[in-house]
Amino acid sequence: MEIKILKSESNYLELEIEGEDHTLGNLIAGTLRKISGVSFASYYQPHPLTDKIIVKILTDGSIAPKDALLKAIETVRVMASHYIDEIKGLTK
């Protein structure tokens, strides 16, 4: 995975993430949209034959886009950890 900043402003961030597809894009954008202060979050895959997504984040200024992204990633990490613990606790 390689991440490139395509555009960065005080309330807008656009990233290119190489080596990823809709799986990560949908998870990140969906989580970002639940964060207070995020006005808009989306992603798209420029071409269906490439493993690359573009993520766009727009905030209302109460949170920096990079901070919103970090919060979204931490939320996903905690959620995944919770699911791992739940699955480990299942009995056969």
Curated annotation (Swiss-Prot):
Compartments (UniProt record): Cytoplasm
Classify the main location. Answer: cytoplasm
* A Gene Ontology biological process term: DNA-templated transcription
* Superkingdom of the source species: Archaea
- Could you name the Gene Ontology cellular component terms for this entry? cytoplasm; DNA-directed RNA polymerase complex
Q: Name one Pfam family in it.
A: RNA_pol_L_2
Provide the catalytic activity annotation: RNA(n) + a ribonucleoside 5'-triphosphate = RNA(n+1) + diphosphate
Key word Transferase present = yes
Any idea which UniProt keywords this protein has?
Cytoplasm, DNA-directed RNA polymerase, Nucleotidyltransferase, Transcription, Transferase
From the UniProt record, which GO molecular function terms apply?
DNA binding; DNA-directed RNA polymerase activity; protein dimerization activity
Q: What is its EC number?
A: 2.7.7.6
Q: What does this protein do?
A: DNA-dependent RNA polymerase (RNAP) catalyzes the transcription of DNA into RNA using the four ribonucleoside triphosphates as substrates.
* Family that this chain belongs to: Belongs to the archaeal Rpo11/eukaryotic RPB11/RPC19 RNA polymerase subunit family.
Its subunit composition reads: Part of the 13-subunit RNA polymerase complex.
Protein name (record): DNA-directed RNA polymerase subunit Rpo11
Q: Which organism is it from?
A: Saccharolobus shibatae (strain ATCC 51178 / DSM 5389 / JCM 8931 / NBRC 15437 / B12)
Q: What is the lineage of its organism?
A: Archaea, Thermoproteota, Thermoprotei, Sulfolobales, Sulfolobaceae
Q: Which gene encodes it?
A: rpo11
